[in-house]
Amino acid sequence: MEEDNQEIQRDNVGSSSFFKTCFNALNALSGIGILSVPYSLARGGWLSLSLLLLLAVTAFYTSLLITKCMNADRNIKTYPDIGERAFGRPGRIIVSVFMHLELYLVTTGFLILEGDNLHNLFPGFTIEMIGLRLNGKQAFMATVAFVIMPTLWWDNLSVLSYVSMSGVLATTVTLGSISWIGAFDGIGFHQKGKLINWSGIPTALSLYAFCYGAHPVLPTLYSSMKSKHQFNNVLLICFILCTIGYTSMAVLGYLMYGSQTLSQITLNLPIHKTSSKVAIYTTLVNPVAKYALMITPTVNTIKDWFPSRYSKKAYLHLLISTFFIISSVVIAETLPFFGYMMSLVGALLSVTVSILLPCLCYLKIFGNYKKIGCETIMLFGMVVMSVFVGVIGTYIALRDIIGSV
């Protein structure tokens, strides 16, 4: 009853409708991860699809835990608030570090993706400005950052939902275009692939985890929603749709290119085909649509460090957002390895913020760790699994990155 009363109190806060929240959540959960799932399947083999489904169920369950934690205290608005409610000031700091580092590296991955695909289409592109010459991927990363920048100046998620619609549409069109290429443009679905590749399982698992790493954004979406009692329905719809999309893309891409599948399926496509260009161009919409949504929690956190008379100023939001995208460009051009970077994010950060931290915070807030039951045993099992995956996956990702520098 107390939980219901808290939900009713919270219903008066927020401006986003059910459908707008759905679009924002779909935009956060879907996106560039869908381009890497064929590569993940190629690394792990057909049986690794079971890991994708297991992670989908696990991530959905932990998203419900986040909602329960927010309902435990009506003052909780963000993911770091959950950490503080559970473990005090140290909990807030730990959650903040992992959450914001994940969001930062994911958005950096957006720029790497853009640079890779645009360079594949236009290999001779260069930019000369104030005595500086940028070639190929570097030039495209800088150009895309300039295009994305205006979307960062909106801090209203209700407004951003309209941008999110374009991101969701782009993901759908990309999946449809790649299906068309396989069926009608001479590629076919003839590759048999391997049943399982044990050496590639850690990388596959890390990349699958990356696909479900949107948990840091969920408290922001929850706080922005009018009818918060419907948020669990939003999560269910979004996780089902995204998992169908991820599974479909993984199977189609692996059947098309087998062991030759690259870290982004769009890099395998024959660029002279119209359908390939449609897939690539629509793929390029996703970073534009997602960047602002993903970076909003980090920007809001930094704004809260300033005195209240400054934190509400529009120019502060503009300055912080602009700094973030400029620094993302620097990192992207220094380490332009999409597959390895996303594998690192998945293993070290997505597993932590999407599985480990929600379980630990829930156990502490509700005191479940004090009593042995089926739920407690399951949660501790998820904690052990996430630590194991995180350690092994992080080691392999760092090894691959260092070997490529």
Curated annotation (Swiss-Prot):
Family indicated by similarity: Belongs to the amino acid/polyamine transporter 2 family. Amino acid/auxin permease (AAAP) (TC 2.A.18.5) subfamily.
Name of the protein described by the UniProt record: Amino acid transporter AVT1I
Single GO BP term: amino acid transport
Transmembrane regions: 22-42, 46-66, 93-113, 140-160, 169-189, 201-221, 234-254, 278-298, 318-338, 343-363, 377-397
Membrane topology: Multi-pass membrane protein
Top-level taxon in the UniProt lineage: Eukaryota
Pfam families reported in the protein's UniProt record: Aa_trans
Localization annotation: Membrane
One Gene Ontology CC term in the entry: plant-type vacuole
Keywords: Amino-acid transport, Membrane, Transmembrane, Transmembrane helix, Transport
